[in-house]
């Protein structure tokens, strides 16, 4: 176990937000993968006991013994009690900037590990400033970004660098993550978080600067480096022989990867570079597709910057928190990512990362679940803080993702 300071606790994992769409997917996965009479002790939590009972009933008779815990996101006493009963809290209650702060504080104070799906850079920065030092004292591992943003990217860099070092004796001086293909929809929670993030950035220039700065999640005094702003336009990549467009999640993922590198003590060197983009194809059609993608993303961000149009988007266009695709669409989904690393001598090292379900729901719920189980059950380095998936879990998490969550990490010739 990774946290001797926790002592004996009633549960290994408590799922907060179990009545939401993603929370229910997590509950289904834990039941299917770990059952209720095995080594993993888990419970469901939320603010409405009746809805919790409905979720438990929907899981079938095999879940009849799963404990239910009532805890509202703003009830500090209930949250503290919840955290003291478990090794890990897994939460799907977002936007986290609105609903997550008190739970993080309770986890830190009780030395309880924590994982979420937050992609809200401004809020993660706030949690680092408020709780990193205290979490180091209590041993609590506070791990944000445990879904499609940013597990495949953060763990992917960890994987490629170690594979490169093992094969060539040196780390890559740069890595590019290219999204080759995805099938699926962004979760309602992710979209709600994105809308709130844009809203807050319009109201507070400091938040806007945090979103733009490439090293804004790095430790204080370590926010300089070679990387600039994330890709903003269509660019032709000679190494991929294709056009690329901006990737909507790059603004989160790239900062998480850079924080991982900083927390690890800069093993790849302080001149290490990292970027992300979407492959749009070759020739004129690739350029045109990339241009349409870029303009479409820009249009959404522009419309979301103003209250009236943002409200219209949330009401009529974007999926809402608690909504999601049916099971067939989840199973039909997938993602396929390509990494291109460059060694100091110019040698290219490539890897492929894939997921077997839609990134927004099916794969994300499995990744988040395995992060929680990893924090609860695996032998991890015994230190706390506001961490990243790669720094907090590293190799044990890759093993779990490969074995249980349908992800692949492969070095390519």
Which residues does each predicted region cover?
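N-terminal Rossmann NAD(P)H-binding glycine-rich loop of SDR-like oxidoreductase domains
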Residues: 11-34
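Conserved Rossmann-fold cofactor-binding substructure of NAD(P)-dependent oxidoreductases
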Residues: 70-86, 92-98
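Structural motif
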Residues: 12, 87-88, 113
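Rossmann-fold cofactor-recognition segment
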Residues: 59-75
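C-terminal catalytic/substrate-binding lobe primarily of soluble NAD(P)-dependent oxidoreductases
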Residues: 2-6, 23, 162-413
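Conserved glycine-rich Rossmann-like NAD(P)H-binding loop of the short-chain dehydrogenase/reductase
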Residues: 35-51
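A short, Lys/Arg-enriched amphipathic alpha-helix followed by its capping loop at the start of a domain
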Residues: 29-39, 264-266
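Glycine-/Pro-rich loop/turn segments that contact NAD(P) or position catalytic residues
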Residues: 95-216
């Amino acid at each position: 176990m990774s946290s001797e300071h926790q002592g004996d606790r009633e549960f290994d994992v408590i799922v907060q937000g179990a009545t939401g769409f993603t929370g229910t997917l997590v509950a289904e996965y834990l039941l299917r993968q770990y059952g209720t009479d095995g080594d993993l002790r888990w419970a469901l939590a939320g603010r409405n006991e009746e809805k919790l009972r409905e979720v438990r009933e929907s899981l079938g008779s095999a879940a009849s013994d799963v404990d239910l815990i009532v805890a509202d996101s703003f009830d500090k006493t209930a949250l503290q009690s919840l955290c003291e009963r478990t090794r890990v809290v897994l939460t799907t209650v977002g936007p986290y900037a609105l609903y997550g702060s008190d739970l993080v504080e309770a986890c830190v104070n009780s030395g309880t590990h924590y994982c979420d799906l937050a992609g809200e850079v401004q809020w993660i920065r706030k949690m680092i400033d408020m709780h990193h030092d205290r979490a180091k004292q209590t041993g609590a591992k506070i791990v944000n970004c445990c879904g499609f943003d940013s597990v495949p990217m953060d763990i992917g860099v960890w994987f490629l660098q170690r594979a490169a070092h093992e094969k060539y004796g040196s780390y890559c001086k740069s890595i590019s993550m290219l999204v080759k293909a995805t099938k699926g929809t962004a979760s309602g929670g992710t979209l709600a978080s994105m809308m709130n993030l844009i809203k807050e950035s319009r109201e507070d220039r400091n938040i806007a600067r945090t979103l733009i700065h490439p090293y804004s999640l790095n430790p204080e005094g370590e926010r300089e480096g070679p990387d600039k702003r994330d890709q903003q336009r269509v660019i032709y990549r000679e190494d991929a022989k294709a056009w690329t467009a901006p990737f909507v999640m790059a603004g989160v993922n790239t900062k998480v990867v850079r924080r991982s590198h900083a927390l690890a003590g800069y093993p790849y060197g302080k001149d290490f570079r990292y970027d992300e983009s979407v492959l749009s194809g070759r020739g004129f059609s690739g350029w045109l597709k990339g241009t349409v993608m870029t303009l479409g993303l820009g249009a959404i961000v522009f419309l979301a910057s103003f209250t009236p149009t943002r409200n219209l988007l949330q009401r009529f266009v974007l999926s809402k928190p608690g909504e999601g695709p049916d099971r067939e669409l989840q199973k039909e989904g997938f993602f396929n990512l390509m990494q291109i690393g460059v060694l100091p001598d110019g040698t290219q090292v490539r890897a492929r990362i894939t997921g077997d379900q839609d990134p927004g729901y099916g794969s994300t719920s499995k990744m988040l679940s395995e992060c929680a189980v990893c924090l609860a059950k695996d032998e991890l380095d015994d230190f706390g803080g506001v961490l990243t998936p790669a720094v907090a879990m590293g190799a044990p998490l890759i093993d779990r993702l490969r074995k249980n969550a349908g992800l692949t990490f492969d070095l390519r010739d």
